[in-house]
């Protein structure tokens, strides 16, 4: 009886660890929405935006890489909302995105990627789903987030080996090409 309990506990812990590793995606993104410049609006849409963007970045499987939780790429998406229209759900924002990685054989991190995007503009409805389909780029917010996710991953891989992120950076370039059809000036 005791052996059976030990065996059950052992198998359960193995399954839990396997599930945790299999679920781990490439990014560990922290998303912050700064809406100080926007007044007279309900905060629900901003909270929903922050939650959905965080889930989208962290839960999406961007590549075929298999990473453990501690190997995820640390990144920050700081979105400053300059204007918001609740009539057409449009956001005019500035994005500051950064990623960092551990310095080899050290205990500290260094910045691998940093970019300020003054034209981070999109439409977002509070209950809409963010879904990435590489073969059909039809949502501005999803395209922007996917572009930056691929940039972060590609550059991170480049820091580990020369041209190591080329394939992933090519995916970012494909999004730029597809983004031309979205009628937002930032892609041109």
Model-derived features: where do they sit?
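Acidic/His-rich structured neighborhood in mature extracellular/periplasmic domains
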Residues: 92-188
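Sec/Tat signal peptide C-region and signal peptidase I cleavage site
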Residues: 20-24
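Positively charged n-region of N-terminal signal peptides that target proteins for export
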Residues: 1-5
